[in-house]
Regions:
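Charge-dense, helix-prone N-terminal extensions
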Residues: 1-194
Length: 194
């Protein structure tokens, strides 16, 4: 099986990001900040996380205080950028809860902006108190294949944001079976307030 089967259809995180259909899901805002409803099929989320875990240099596992219903996504020490503002904590760029399906990702601020404006995410509650970097987002879980594609793209942006140039230029990351033309920089336009 192609570990990057869906990475061929990445969506640009920019003004062209499609709007998420329907109302924003209800969330409980607090230190945990979870999505309360409007979840898709649990299997789609688990398959997406399995796909992301297979990407190069990703270490996945529960947090020390976690459970089997929580997956922490970290990049390997040798390829992690030294900028702490791109991580939730340590080298963790993403976290997924399965009990109350919720996705947490650290995104570049321009991507976070478009994810919020287009209805795909909201800032993590703890960011307003400086407890997590401002790019940490609660990304709404996918309800169908089109939404899986958007979430996959958001995971991809978060993952690349956490890598050093060396990590993005590694042989494994650039392997031909990946099926994606990679850019070593993330370039999204920043929206101007009007």
């Amino acid at each position: 099986m192609d570990r990057f089967r869906g990475a061929k259809n990445l969506i640009t995180i920019s003004p062209s990001l499609p709007n998420r259909r329907g109302k924003r899901p209800i969330t409980i805002r607090g230190p945990l900040h979870v999505q309360c409803g409007d979840h898709g099929d649990d299997r789609e989320l688990r398959d997406l996380v399995d796909e992301v875990i297979a990407w190069p240099h990703i270490e996945a596992g529960p947090l020390p205080v976690g459970s089997v219903d929580l997956v922490s996504l970290q990049v390997g020490r040798e390829v992690a950028t030294g900028d702490p503002s791109v991580f939730i904590t340590g080298r963790e760029f993403g976290r997924v809860l399965f009990g109350a399906p919720t996705i947490y990702l650290t995104l570049p601020l321009s991507c976070a902006h478009w994810a919020i404006v287009r209805g795909w995410a909201e800032p993590h509650f703890s960011g307003s108190f400086g407890l997590v970097p401002p790019g940490v987002m609660v990304v709404y879980t996918p309800r169908d294949e089109q939404e899986v594609a958007v979430c996959r793209s958001l995971f991809w942006v978060s993952y690349n944001f956490s890598l050093t140039d060396r990590g993005r230029n590694s042989d494994e990351w650039n392997a031909p079976w990946v099926g994606v033309t990679h850019s070593s920089t993330i370039e999204e336009p920043v929206a101007a307030a009007g």
